[in-house]
Amino acid sequence: MRVLVVGGTGTLGRQIVRQAIDQGHTVVCLVRSLRKAAFLKEWGATIVGGNICKPETLSPALENIDAVIDASTARATDSLTIRQVDWEGKLNLIRAVQKAGIKKFVFFSILRAAEYPKVPLMDIKNCTEKFLAQTNLDYTILQLAGFMQGLIGQYAIPILDNQSVWQTGENTPIAYMNTQDVAKFAVRAVELDSVARKTYPVVGSRAWGATEIIQLCERMSGNNARISQVPMAVLRFMRSFTRFFQWTYNASDRLAFSEVLASGKALTADMAPVYEQFGLDPKETTTLESYLQEYFGRIIKKLKELDYEVNPTQTEGKKKKNNFFF
């Protein structure tokens, strides 16, 4: 099958590209920067320049394509807003896919998006789901909760580097999933006719709260976390303040997501029927414990090789501060 992956350079997109190639599919990637996508070409994918925010650039990438997996999203460093990329850009892509006569389309949404109409990203995801339902596409919607990869920068690195870990209290438990495992569901979605025009949760085996994750990182790293509390009132003020300036709209929209994280409503779901439908084995899915154990084991080994001190309380003689993480 000839599969177009949109957003192939991202955290999730690159795993989808790898999984699709490993499964024997011919992969084409629509990317904004050919230079940044060079590694995808080395893997065996065909790279085509284009931008979902510029509809006139989409048709060349859609030629002779059997299925589209859309993993694109606005990044925190983008000059474009979430609305421009995740709403207007998505509509451009969906319409272009329809015009090209392609039927299979995989879209990533967020679990329980319909419950948060005042949170821009959640509202946009919910509206896109409704828009897809009105098309003639054989779409599959995969509703995600959170990626394990994001926990490295949020918790693991600060704890290893003896920096502050920021918390807003006891946050919403989230069933995080490894992007490699999410990619398996995405590729299976284009292979299976039985999942057409359906919506599925794709989440980890267990929901974890912020305190539990911090304790897990402390145990595996041997360091104690320095926790700094940020009251929700402060985040709400920052969101309101950043709405005054056009160049901070993106930051404001992302701050709004803190309402979801502080709601206390767990982002999790029963995955047993989903694994059965997709023909995947839940035993092969990465657990958060194993993911963090592998990360800390690799990093601590590397630090020891570089003669860095991981725990400053055990420092003898000259202390070296670690700023090297990957």
Swiss-Prot record:
The keyword Oxidoreductase applies. It is a peripheral membrane protein. Keywords: Membrane, Oxidoreductase, Photosynthesis, Photosystem II, Thylakoid. It is found in: Cellular thylakoid membrane. Disruption phenotype: No visible growth phenotype except under high light (700 umols photons/m(2)/s) where cells become temporarily photoinhibited. Decreased synthesis of D1 (psbA), loss of RCII* assembly complex, considerable decrease in PSII intermediate assembly complexes. SUPFAM superfamilies: NAD(P)-binding Rossmann-fold domains (SSF51735). GO terms for cellular component: photosystem II; plasma membrane-derived thylakoid membrane. GO terms for biological process: photosynthesis. The keyword Thylakoid applies. It holds the Pfam family NAD_binding_10. It comes from the Bacteria. One of its GO terms (molecular function) is oxidoreductase activity. Its EC number is 1.-.-.-. Belongs to the NmrA-type oxidoreductase family. Ycf39 subfamily. Requires HliD to bind pigments. The Ycf39-Hlip complex binds D1 at an early stage of PSII assembly along with Ycf48, ribosomes and ChlG, the last enzyme in chlorophyll biosynthesis; it may be involved in chlorophyll reuse and delivery to D1 in the initial stages of PSII assembly. The Ycf39-Hlip complex efficiently quenches chlorophyll fluorescence, contributing to photoprotection. Purified in several chlorophyll- and carotenoid-containing complexes, including photosystem II (PSII) assembly intermediate complex RCII* (iD1, D1, D2, PsbE, PsbF, PsbI, Ycf39, Ycf48, HliC and HliD) and the Ycf39-Hlip complex (Ycf39, HliC, HliD and pigments). Tagged protein does not pull down mature PSII. This is Photosystem II assembly factor Ycf39. It comes from Synechocystis sp. (strain ATCC 27184 / PCC 6803 / Kazusa). The lineage of its organism: Bacteria, Bacillati, Cyanobacteriota, Cyanophyceae, Synechococcales.
